[in-house]
């Protein structure tokens, strides 16, 4: 998403909107966006970007500094039309990055708005997006794969099964953070994890536990000086952090869930979902 001109699928989507051949490859809530996909790429409000000339029409494209966006067919400016009028005719809405935490309408990789999710849960999209990977194995270029965060997928089990079939059961490891005592699910078609749990064990070998007392004392002094509350029990820290994420950088996703549930899009519903 960060460089639409380098991604033919995304470029076609921005050009043709819902009518794009590749529209089904991306998970976009078109209705919430008023029929447009919202792109949080601006450093200011769009009116200010237009007023300063940072946003401009350049041939058959909209330009914002180094960012390029296609104009929809038939949407080029006529005489005396300003850039905001042209922008209003596009299948995308350029908006300030400050809105990304609560106003996005496309699925992304966790809180990284520059990485739009591809709907690999759809067999046709999987086949189209993994053809090159299949060729690597057919040509003997690679022997295995690392899959980043499969839990971020809509259907991780089915995805790994398709990947296993595509690669003829090649060596595949997944980036999955396991809790202490947790094991990789047996139903994952994978040979193991990327090793974070092993790294945690190695860390314990290399770190002197006698330093804990000194670090705890330093933490207490800093909390007293800064006015921070006393240390909370670890489960409370985890629960509070998860809630902060749901109410912060992933609020767009929480709002999407409330809409998918058919529930009111208000603070009370968001709180219940989080």
What are these regions (language model features)?
Residues 29, 183-274:
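Conserved alpha/beta catalytic core and glycan-binding cleft of carbohydrate-active enzymes
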Residues 114-123, 146-151:
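The substrate-binding groove and active-site-proximal loops of carbohydrate-active enzymes
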Residues 1-107, 139, 149-222:
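Acidic/aromatic-lined carbohydrate-recognition and catalytic surfaces
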Residues 125-138:
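Structured alpha-helical segments in the cores of large, soluble enzyme domains
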Residues 135-147:
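A conserved hydrophobic secondary-structure block that centers on an alpha-helix together
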Residues 122-126, 250:
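A conditional alpha-helix N-cap/helix-loop micro-motif detector
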Residues 101-120:
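N-terminal small/glycine-rich loop or linker at the start of catalytic domains
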């Amino acid at each position: 998403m960060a460089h639409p001109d380098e991604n033919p699928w995304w470029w076609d989507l921005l050009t043709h909107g819902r009518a794009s051949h590749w529209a089904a490859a991306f998970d976009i809530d078109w209705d919430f966006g008023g029929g447009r996909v919202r792109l949080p790429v601006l450093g200011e409000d769009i009116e200010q970007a237009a007023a300063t000339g940072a946003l401009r029409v350049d041939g058959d494209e909209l330009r914002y500094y180094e960012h390029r966006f296609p104009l929809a067919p038939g949407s080029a400016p006529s005489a005396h039309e300003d850039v905001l009028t042209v922008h209003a005719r596009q299948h995308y809405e350029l908006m300030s990055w400050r809105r990304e935490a609560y106003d996005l309408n496309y699925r992304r990789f966790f809180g990284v708005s520059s990485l739009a999710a591809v709907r690999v849960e759809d067999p046709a999209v999987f086949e189209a997006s993994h053809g090159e990977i299949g060729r690597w194995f057919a040509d003997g270029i690679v022997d295995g794969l690392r899959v980043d965060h499969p839990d971020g997928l809509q259907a991780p089990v089915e995805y790994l099964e398709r990947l296993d079939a595509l690669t003829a059961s090649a060596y595949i490891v997944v980036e999955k953070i396991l809790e202490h005592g947790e094991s990789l699910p047996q139903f994952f078609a994978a040979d193991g994890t990327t090793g974070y749990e092993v790294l945690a064990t190695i860390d314990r070998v290399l770190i002197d536990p006698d330093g804990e007392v000194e670090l705890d004392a330093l933490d207490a002094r800093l909390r007293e000086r800064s006015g921070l509350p006393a240390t909370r029990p670890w489960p409370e820290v985890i629960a509070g952090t998860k809630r902060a994420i749901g109410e912060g950088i992933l609020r767009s996703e929480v709002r999407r869930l409330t809409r998918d549930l058919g529930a009111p899009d208000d603070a009370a519903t968001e709180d219940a979902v989080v």
